[in-house]
């Protein structure tokens, strides 16, 4: 299967691109404390994707992963700054959580969704069972779904997750 570098974005032969949650976090989550060269590389690539109008797909599973990871990072950051240990469920009752939740929802509504096509998959029972029966146990359940999304819509997956390295989709 094809493997592309960020610099090859103009050479994709697929109908569009799907960003894994980690890419959205590199682009828009300052709490991640990511390596600056990685953030810059993905930011330049994203700007080029928008410039050439390459369709970018997202779905509810990816958005859910972005939201949940962003909130978990905020929880960790909050506890570290407060010098405390706090259960995540207790954190959800804090003003900080409410502020971050509004922030991440706004991010999705204003910075992600306006530039994306929603790529849905309707699973029938047999398709759902095939997700559960897949013999590739190195990937988590959501990764199986994202692979199917890319296959269904002929998408290249942009990810920084090595779990996808042996998939049958272009990356």
Language model regions located:
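A short, hydrophobic secondary-structure junction motif
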Residues: 21-24, 44-57, 95-119
